[in-house]
Amino acid sequence: MALGPGCRAVRGCRPVLKRAFSLHKAHSVKDMESILQLVRSVVPALTTKKHKGQDGRIGVVGGCREYTGAPYFAAISALKVGADLSHVFCTQEAAPVIKAYSPELIVHPVLDSPEAVRDVEQWLPRLHALVVGPGLGRDDALLENVKGILEASKARGIPVVIDADGLWLIAQQPALIQGYRKAVLTPNHVEFGRLSEAVLGVPLDGGDRHGAVLRLSQALGNVTVVQKGEQDVISDGEQVLECSQEGSGRRCGGQGDLLSGSLGVLAHWALRAGPQKTGGPSPLLVAAFGACALTRQCSQQAFQKYGRATTTSDMVAEVGPAFRRLFEA
């Protein structure tokens, strides 16, 4: 990414790359507010004229014997952000556990079935977005089924958020989402390094996170990439955003699932609203920024109450208040 003279040393300095801009670590409140305003513009109004399902039917693909919390956190977060219906497509062993967590989720025990792809594919016409990977695990048979589900989702043009072991699959087979611009990858530091090695053949450049995320997105054909970290760096290969909404120092497991579930809903809303509402940034960039800001705000609010004892369940309880504070105040 080309920068103006001395740009790296100047707070709030913007790159000169065409159509790209970056909100740096010490970006102005005005810049943050302008992006948050774009997120607000895609949030649908709650009215009595709507019917169930119009504001989002989200599917989460993941959940196995070892990992039942992750798909629950993603699916329940989608509901709390504002989706009307939230489905979980998991293994047979995981289903009773996830059902027991919440009666509000629609749980399908099909992911380890020989007919898993067909079973999930029949639901795709009813879904607005998929979140793939929370609690998936790395069983070869499950990954093969998820590969088929991804191909079917792409064929229907369904937005796909990929996290956790879904990213492991992409690192093994990047062609699965190459050029699919309705995909969003949400890697943490380790997952991003693995993707960078697999796609670019180079180790992670920790000194230039903005450039690293931009290059990975471009190499994948402008798939949106969210590198989670002290600040979240987001790029669609053309633009780069940085979200440094205040969060907390607590790093309990499950926060990424809250982000991915939230992002599934926001992606649907942003794509439905279209670029005329999101202005310069693409709809998925705006959605990703919104999900990052919301997750950080939930973390901050939960930490203020529980401090070191904060868990992701505490953060999920803050989704409603945090959403109102950021997007409906």
From Swiss-Prot:
The modification N6-acetyllysine is found at residue 49. Residues 35-326 form the YjeF C-terminal domain. Its EC number is 4.2.1.93. One of its GO terms (molecular function) is ATP binding. One of its GO terms (biological process) is metabolite repair. Residues 1-28 form a transit peptide. It catalyses: (6S)-NADHX + ATP = ADP + phosphate + NADH + H(+); (6S)-NADPHX + ATP = ADP + phosphate + NADPH + H(+). It is found in: Mitochondrion. Gene3D superfamilies: 3.40.1190.20. Its main location: mitochondrion. (6S)-NADPHX binds at residues 135, 188-194, 257. Keywords: Acetylation, ATP-binding, Lyase, Mitochondrion, NAD, NADP, Nucleotide-binding, Phosphoprotein, Transit peptide. It holds the Pfam family Carb_kinase. ATP binds at residues 228-232, 247-256. InterPro entries: CARKD (IPR000631), Ribokinase-like (IPR029056). Belongs to the NnrD/CARKD family. Catalyzes the dehydration of the S-form of NAD(P)HX at the expense of ATP, which is converted to ADP. Together with NAD(P)HX epimerase, which catalyzes the epimerization of the S- and R-forms, the enzyme allows the repair of both epimers of NAD(P)HX, a damaged form of NAD(P)H that is a result of enzymatic or heat-dependent hydration. This is ATP-dependent (S)-NAD(P)H-hydrate dehydratase. The lineage of its organism: Eukaryota, Metazoa, Chordata, Craniata, Vertebrata.
